[in-house]
């Protein structure tokens, strides 16, 4: 039997697998590490231990009958604000290298394996001032392992992968490696604009305006006046060019359109022809459908895997151990 934990800022997801890698059970709780942000290391670590063993106690009790492999942990639990900070592996990264570079910790006679993150620029000169080149991810690589593991043919799994969210990731995966990636803080910017700025202050609740969204996706992708376009959300309401109920769709479209432009440019620079294959989108269903709509508006094809990619990723890693 094996146990794996996907532990992020807002959620805790636990998976139990059989010896042959079949998913037996999944549990989820709103116990993200953000709940203890700002507390002392000792307080946070005690809380992490309590949460882990409370949610997995009955699974661990079975180890007297069925031996339990080390518990795999991925996500922000392995960050500087988590339980054990693990190093970043520099791209390009073969995904099996995650288990090879895991950090081990023993708690209550149970071995925990904290998986590393992935980075761009981690091996650069520490005196380098090229901050815009730096990038990191923790947790998304697990979903990528699941998405690329459906085929043993590395050519079939090669392509561009998008993981939308607070900090969206665009990943160039080919030749069996995570070659490069690009982060766009689209979700965080959208939330900030809507909740904490004058730009979003005139917005109002209402049904999603798909037409406004698609038009602003095109504007965000093609416009050379992106920043002033954001202010258009406020000016447009004042001049009655856009309804207050459509402001969220307008801002979302602008941000996602610009994100797509930057993500596509990342892969074009590396020489990949992204328009020749479907872009794979991994994440929450509603958000994935929004990105599919945006990509379709711009003439790109996309696909959304049906399975739980984190579970598939853990299963693939366990098979390599």
Functional labels for PLM-detected ranges:
Residues 2-4, 8-46:
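Short glycine-rich, Thr/Ser-proximal phosphate-binding strand/loop in the N-terminal lobe
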Residues 293, 303-321:
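Glycine-rich phosphate-binding/hydrolytic loop that grips phosphoryl groups
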Residues 2-6, 70-72, 159-163:
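Short glycine-aspartate micro-motif
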Residues 32-40, 120-219, 223:
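Glycine-rich phosphate-binding loop plus the immediately following alpha-helix
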Residues 52-70, 260-274:
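Phosphate/pyrophosphate-binding loops at sites that engage ATP/ADP/AMP, CoA/4′-phosphopantetheine
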């Amino acid at each position: 039997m094996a146990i794996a934990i996907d532990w992020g800022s807002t959620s805790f997801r636990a998976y139990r697998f059989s010896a042959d890698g079949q998913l037996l059970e999944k549990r989820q709780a709103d116990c993200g590490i953000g709940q203890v942000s700002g507390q002392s290391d000792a307080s946070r670590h005690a809380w992490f231990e309590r949460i882990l063993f409370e949610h997995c106690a009955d699974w661990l009790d079975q180890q007297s009958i069925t031996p339990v492999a080390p518990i795999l942990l991925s996500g922000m639990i392995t960050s500087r604000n988590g339980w054990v900070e693990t190093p970043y592996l520099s791209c390009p990264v073969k995904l099996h290298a995650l288990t090879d570079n895991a950090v081990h910790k023993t708690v209550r006679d149970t071995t925990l394996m904290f998986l590393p993150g992935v980075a761009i620029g981690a091996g650069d000169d520490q005196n380098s001032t090229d901050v815009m080149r730096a990038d990191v991810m923790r947790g998304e690589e697990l979903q990528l392992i699941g998405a690329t593991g459906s085929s043993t043919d590395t050519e079939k799994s090669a392509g561009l992968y998008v993981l939308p969210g607070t900090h969206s990731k665009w990943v160039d995966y080919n030749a069996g490696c995570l070659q490069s990636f690009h982060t766009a803080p689209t979700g965080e910017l959208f939330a900030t604009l809507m909740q904490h700025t004058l730009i979003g202050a005139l917005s109002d609740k209402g049904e999603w305006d798909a037409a406004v969204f698609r038009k602003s996706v095109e504007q965000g992708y093609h416009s050379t006046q992106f920043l002033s376009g954001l202010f258009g959300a406020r000016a447009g309401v004042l001049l009655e060019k856009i309804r207050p109920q459509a402001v969220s769709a307008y801002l979302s479209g602008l941000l996602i359109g610009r994100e797509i432009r930057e993500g596509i440019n990342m892969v074009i620079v590396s020489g990949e022809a992204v328009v020749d294959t479907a872009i794979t989108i991994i994440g929450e269903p509603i958000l994935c459908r929004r990105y599919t709509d945006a990509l379709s508006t711009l003439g790109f094809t996309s696909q959304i895997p049906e399975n739980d990619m984190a579970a598939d990723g853990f299963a693939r890693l366990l098979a390599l151990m």
